Amino acid sequence: MSVYKHAPSRVRLRQTRSTVVKGRSGSLSWRRVRTGDLGLAVWGGREEYRAVKPGTPGIQPKGDMMTVTVVDAGPGRVSRSVEVAAPAAELFAIVADPRRHRELDGSGTVRGNIKVPAKLVVGSKFSTKMKLFGLPYRITSRVTALKPNELVEWSHPLGHRWRWEFESLSPTLTRVTETFDYHAAGAIKNGLKFYEMTGFAKSNAAGIEATLAKLSDQYARGRA
């Protein structure tokens, strides 16, 4: 998911009929189809979909799958959004239950929960098993904002935050926005450009895109 930390190990694309472009961004390598094809990306050994900003070369959605778009949320924030064919309350319920975060994860890093409260409120803490670069670890996050059916946000021990927002466009369509927010993670880290220099900002952007594309496609498949 883009829910905690993303470090995709590789990305593979099945070409169907368009020109393929190769590239590299930090630790992330990709192959992009310019128009009209479905991209199949492998994130940490799991097949997921990847979408990009409309109007630029990239992997495009197929059928009813919505395009993941870049959101300008300001400095120190990596944000993407997608429209999902589901009610806002249903999508909120998934994110507001940490036990279901593995369902959302497009990065392959989320493993499961160690300790989760029965219901999240501001100040709640939940612990999660993770795996990155083949190494297992655990983190404890704290809920920093919660508004039923509209917003869930939690802070990571390093100081950055993950935020999910749900905008109801109709009873069956929701714009979902996920943001990796590190602008207030600390003066030292920000001064050293820690998240940019380590590649975390770029890898988390890729993980968010994979997660949102996966979520959108799951509901698009359900309607097919």
UniProtKB/Swiss-Prot annotation:
InterPro entries reported for this sequence: Polyketide_cyclase/dehydratase, START-like_dom_sf
One Gene Ontology cellular component annotation held by this UniProt entry: peptidoglycan-based cell wall
Protein name per its UniProtKB record: Uncharacterized protein Rv0088
